[in-house]
Amino acid sequence: MNQVENQSKEGYWAVQVDSVSLDSNQVSGSSTAVLDTGTSLIIAPKSAADKIHDAIPGAKSDGHGGYTLPCTTRKKLSFKISGTTHTMDSRDLLFAPKDSNNLKGTCISAVSSGETMDGASWLLGAAFLKNVYFATNSDANRIGLGKLKN
């Protein structure tokens, strides 16, 4: 498990992100991300969220920070944190189908754009966190992130 220093002074758990990529294409450089077990989605800066969805055929913005994409999308979103790349399962880029009777139709994206609570660039909720082992050490003010075994 990779141990990193908590970047937040506000009581959140935050990490320094080296880069964010969709498949092998970088969509964001160095930034900070809050790791939030109470959030389902990923909240990204608008420019990064637009780059992610522009690279997915059939993806569309709803004009209010949300996006839709084909439920058949198999792109992988990766976050490089302290030199270690953590890649999400492609299914976790899909939050939910718009029509539960059509699982091959349009899905709501697990990535939206917006402002985060402490000014961090990203907020990584369950869509990301279910792809890593995540541990916190409040005494040492450190965060552990580990890769899941297949």
Q: What name fits each language-model region?
A:
Residues 1-150:
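Active-site or ligand-binding cleft "flap/edge" segments
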